[in-house]
Amino acid sequence: SKIYIEKYGAPRDVDDLDDCPLIAYGNHAPATLRNVNWPQTIGVKSHNRPRATILQVNNIYGLLLAIESGVGIGSLPDYMITPDRPLQRILPEIDGPTTDAYFVYPEELRNTKRIGVFRDFLEEQVRKWQF
């Protein structure tokens, strides 16, 4: 967050993450959020343990609030980042992991206008997002 960066400065490269307070989703992240804790492991040699965290939460909104409050550094999906939030991307040259998204509905509704319009809207929005 901007609060964190004003207080501690931004990491310049992945090695700087070794000295940053990291916030993680926790050990039981759902499969849809696989690799959400990638700041703990990026750049870490395979024989080393993941970076330590100062806080683990069990939902993505809690992760957002902790990062936003300047508690530490963590990973959020793009769709949670809005211009009105005091967040700042760090290490922009590094792409985080991506996540698959599924739109599930009853087969008998496949050809309805309502489902088609909503599907088109979701596809348009999802193309803008990354995790």
Where are these regions (language model features)?
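C-terminal regulatory
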Residues: 1-101, 127-131
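A cross-family signal for key residues in well-ordered alpha-helices
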Residues: 64, 105, 119
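A bilobed periplasmic-binding-protein/Venus flytrap-type ligand-binding module shared by bacterial periplasmic
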Residues: 101-111
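Short amphipathic alpha-helical coupling segments at ligand-binding clamshell hinges
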Residues: 110-124
